[in-house]
From Swiss-Prot:
GO terms for biological process: cell differentiation; male gonad development; positive regulation of DNA-templated transcription. This is Doublesex- and mab-3-related transcription factor 1. InterPro entries: DM_DNA-bd, DM_DNA-bd_sf, DMRT, DMRT1-like. Transcription factor that plays a key role in male sex determination and differentiation by controlling testis development and germ cell proliferation. Acts both as a transcription repressor and activator. The lineage of its organism: Eukaryota, Metazoa, Chordata, Craniata, Vertebrata. Residues 113-135, 292-311 have a biased composition (Low complexity). Keywords: Activator, Developmental protein, Differentiation, DNA-binding, Metal-binding, Nucleus, Repressor, Sexual differentiation, Transcription, Transcription regulation, Zinc. Its main location: nucleus. Residues 1-17, 319-331 have a biased composition (Polar residues). Residues 32-79 bind DNA. GO terms for molecular function: metal ion binding; sequence-specific DNA binding. It comes from Xenopus tropicalis (Western clawed frog). Residues 1-28, 113-136, 287-337 are annotated as: Disordered.
Amino acid sequence: MQNNEEPFSKTRSSGQHPSGVHGKKSPRLPKCARCRNHGYASPLKGHKRFCMWRDCQCKKCSLIAERQRVMAAQVALRRQQAQEEELGISHPIPLPIAAELLIKREHGGSSSCLMLESSSTQTTSTSTSGSTTSSEGKMLIQEIPSITSRGHLESTSDLVMDSPYYSNFYQPPLYPYYNNLYNYPPYQMAVATESTSGNDMGGISGPSMKNSHRNHPAAYVPSQSGNQWQMKNGENRFPGHSASSQFRMHSYYPPYLGQSVPNPVCVPPFLTFEEIPSYSEAKASVALSPPSSQDSGIISLSSNSPVSNESTKGAAEQEPNSESSAFTVTTAGEDRE
């Protein structure tokens, strides 16, 4: 190996003079330090894996190994600091006048703000060692005229996160049952589904009404006022009638913030399926009201419609069935008494 490496150095030294220009020299090639310590000159490029003294423990080679460890630690430290600066979590920018404790007093303000620079846990030991030794045990009192004249202090506020401000976004809601913006009530609907003929409406009761209502949830949509339900189908049999207070249904979606927001406490209780009277008793209670009133029920029909003649016959046949039902029914007049 000595024969191959020595001529390389000779040809390199001899090749400098034949060149006509003395000012320009070929760049110096790096050599292996371990081989140089043992008297050999070998180029470093591609030689590290094949060096004969890479595991040598002599005094000179041990110094080389120690220097390599120190340089590797410095490179790793610089790389970590660069990553922290990119992520924005580096330590605050030190003030021009290094002070361990800074007391700031505003104009006419009795309270003073204390800033302890050594309380930052993200500062590295190398960056804080110089400032702590030079300013240890010193206190500086600085009068600041106004907030706008802080200068360099404004740049430090960008790096410090205001924890009370950001913690407001993650507070649990006041009503854990409702997890939306408007605190909607649970979806409950106590409106009888529409049947094909008028005489079928009196026969629906109890569980059958619940099952049929689940199959047709989209037959009713909230009106523009948001206080009652209207039919969505094309055959709207009751265009001029509005729902009475007994059959009036509150919509699922409350009005927007521009209107008056309903309070869930003040909403009247929803009617269950057992509390809805049958068609025949509702017909009898509505017949007592004057014909000019607009407060007739959803299930009631006008006297001029041809469907009412057919429905009255079916209601007369189903009166005994409604009286023998398991649950009790109260009309609107009895509730008011």
